[in-house]
Design a protein with these regions (language model features):
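Non-catalytic terminal and connector segments of soluble metabolic enzymes
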Residues: 1-159
Length: 159
């Protein structure tokens, strides 16, 4: 099934100059970027994006982390893109992420460390958790006119 999913390269990924390396991984497996922009979100937008977490103990650290610098927001399209991106990104805690995933390869944080510092875990990437969430997040982050339809070589060989 062809799906669209939201991916955010968080401020730690941007500040560490990992944008190209992360995007290349998604393109290498045939995912198509149909929307992309750099934005610096404020606390109000953070509350909209992380609405499920606003009342949780860790939210203030999460809000500080996501608003500390620019974010690359992308909509990726492809076959089973929600599931594929989640597999590629890896476990939320980089310490437990499987080797070969983005978080295992590029992030170092653990819950133990970040909890001791009172900060949110820096895990480089946000990826929609399921198809329903992906639809909601894409609509929150992108206007319809910011999403594009075009063909790639993968359309010929995969779809």
């Amino acid at each position: 099934m062809i799906e669209r999913t939201l991916v955010l390269l968080k401020p730690d990924a941007v500040q560490r100059a990992l944008i190209g390396k992360v995007i290349q991984r998604f393109e290498n497996v045939g995912l198509k970027i149909v929307g992309m922009k750099m934005v610096w979100i404020d606390k109000n937008f953070s509350k909209k994006h992380y609405s499920a977490h606003v009342e949780k103990k860790f939210y203030s650290g999460l809000e500080n982390m996501i608003t500390e610098g620019p974010v690359i927001a992308m909509v990726l399209e492809g076959l089973h893109s929600v599931e594929l991106v989640r597999k590629m990104v890896g476990s939320t805690e980089p310490r437990t992420a499987q080797p070969g995933t983005i978080r295992a390869d590029f992030a170092q944080h653990s819950y133990e460390y970040t909890d001791s510092k009172g900060k949110a875990i820096k895990n480089l990437v946000h990826a929609s958790g399921n198809i329903k969430e992906a639809k909601q997040e894409v609509e929150l982050w992108f206007k319809p006119e910011e999403l594009h339809i075009y063909k790639t070589v993968h359309d010929i060989h995969v779809l």
